[in-house]
Amino acid sequence: MSFQSHVRNLDDLRGPDGRLEALLNTGTDDAPFTALVTHPHPLFGGTMHNKVVYHAMKAFSHFGLPVLRFNFRGTSRSEGTHDGGRGEIDDVRAALDYLTRTYAKPILFAGFSFGSYTGLRATCGDPRVAGLVALGLPVQAAGRNYTYEFLSTCTQPKVFISGGNDEFCPPEVLQQVAASSPGIWDTFIIPGADHFFQGTLTGPGSQLDGMRGLIQTWLIHKFHLKPLNLQEPLAHS
């Protein structure tokens, strides 16, 4: 089956602080899930156009799923003001509400760094969300400690993917965080990669394709998704 995803600018995604700039990669009519991907810390350049976010979107689009990305409040053209991760949780919930209204299908979530923390806070325990992908989950970054006691009630299937040289969450710490979560969870450590999935055991190089492949493999194994013969989206990144 050949499928060509289109990319749409959304004008009607609104959070508590106003309009949220967003892109929707369209999916097939019979897609069994929709997907949401959230970006890293906006005060350090994170937006929905981040390379890790883009590759996570491609992982979901590989199966013909509609994929929503948006900029947190105060980021780029999104209205409002950055709220240190508190109001951003409500932004994620607004995006979940949008997907539910538009598609009425189970949702798969992926977030990178700050986006994984805020996204997990919003999605853990939400019955609309069927599975969780945490990329580069931060534990200590930019002078802030991120804590994950809330994972003790997070029963959805989840996967944690990080680089072996992630400066914001060493692999042994990530394993401890994952083990605090009940239910089904997996961890994948990419040897040689840093927080942004750059670097190999032998030198420089990107590991984004490998990261994307791990997401796809996990989705096939956990949710029995079938890859489509995809053509590239018509616009945007």
Predicted regions and their residues:
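Serine-hydrolase catalytic machinery in alpha/beta-hydrolase-like enzymes
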Residues: 19-103, 196
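Primarily recognizes the serine-hydrolase "nucleophile elbow" in alpha/beta-hydrolase
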Residues: 90-156
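Catalytic histidine neighborhood in serine/cysteine hydrolases
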Residues: 180-198
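N-terminal cap/lid segment of alpha/beta-hydrolase-fold proteins
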Residues: 1-30
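Catalytic active-site module of serine/aspartate enzymes centered on a nucleophile-bearing elbow/loop
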Residues: 202-237
